[in-house]
């Protein structure tokens, strides 16, 4: 697994031995960034269920303002931190080694807003709808922002979750990317 573009281009990232962490393949990541690249520059990113931190680090490499990495696994967070250091993006990074609900609630209380929110949790733990609802309830998504949910192609998602609506879906073998945006007020 590597950083595809930007100031850390070509950097090989550390990956865990833990099977719960399923890093986004380079092929899927490249396709994803072809879609979301207009959202990256100078914006804030939330990498929920960060795993290796690959998606957030890719955004920072491409010019994102900052990224908050959230993962409750100590092993995953150790890898995220080592990858942040390796990519030399410590100043633009915040790490939260807590569960997603606590993180989302805390970030909401602080008034944080994000233009890109990644949700790439282990496939067998179906917390996506809960995570989408929490993000909506805590007003974390900028009005013009986008949420990217990476999941197994067998899983289907509702058209709407609170004020969020499904704007797009792309399939890559057994991996699907589902995109949500905020309904206009």
Regions found by a protein language model. Give the residues of each.
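Class I S-adenosyl-L-methionine-dependent methyltransferase catalytic core
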Residues: 1-185
